Amino acid sequence: MPTINQLVRKGRVAITAKSKVPALEACPQKRGVCTRVYTTTPKKPNSALRKVCKVRLTNGFEVISYIGGEGHNLQEHSVVLIRGGRVKDLPGVRYHTVRGSLDTAGVKDRKQARSKYGAKRPK
């Protein structure tokens, strides 16, 4: 416990919260260009080929973003919108691509949770 005199001299240091998505710079989304589209494997108990892309953002950051949903149309030089949100079993992936905006197409034949995958309402 510090004495009153020590607190007068120094004061308490406030704990500063560290951002989980620093590349967004306090914005809800950011635009970027795909520099590489590839698949990667998840951590230990899981097994799959997860679709990810390396994105160069408009602010100069280079980040890895997860492409959710079944199938995608992204390739190098595609313009994508990035939102925050990590993928627990992919180390280093802290962003998601927004489906159905800019060059990213929505998921085909999606019936449920359509708004999350940029799918229109089926007729």
UniProtKB/Swiss-Prot annotation:
- Which PROSITE patterns would you find in this protein's record? RIBOSOMAL_S12
Q: Name one GO biological process term.
A: translation
Matching InterPro entries = NA-bd_OB-fold, Ribosomal_uS12, Ribosomal_uS12_bac
Task: Give the matching SUPFAM superfamilies.
Answer: Nucleic acid-binding proteins
Coiled-coil residues: none
Q: Which Gene3D superfamilies does the record cross-reference, listed alphabetically?
A: Nucleic acid-binding proteins
**Pfam families per record:** Ribosom_S12_S23 (PF00164)
Region (Disordered), start-end ranges: 104-123
Compositionally biased tracts (Basic residues): 113-123
Q: Does the keyword Nucleotidyltransferase apply?
A: no
User: What GO annotations for molecular function exist for this entry?
Assistant: rRNA binding; structural constituent of ribosome; tRNA binding
Q: Which residues carry this modification: 3-methylthioaspartic acid?
A: D89
Xref: CDD domains? Ribosomal_S12
One GO cellular-component annotation of the UniProt record comes to: small ribosomal subunit
Q: Which UniProt keywords apply?
A: Methylation, Ribonucleoprotein, Ribosomal protein, RNA-binding, rRNA-binding, tRNA-binding
Function of the protein: With S4 and S5 plays an important role in translational accuracy.
Oligomer and partners: Part of the 30S ribosomal subunit. Contacts proteins S8 and S17. May interact with IF1 in the 30S initiation complex.
Instruction: Please state which protein family the record places this protein in.
Output: Belongs to the universal ribosomal protein uS12 family.
Would you tell me the protein name for this molecule? Small ribosomal subunit protein uS12
Origin organism is Chromobacterium violaceum (strain ATCC 12472 / DSM 30191 / JCM 1249 / CCUG 213 / NBRC 12614 / NCIMB 9131 / NCTC 9757 / MK)
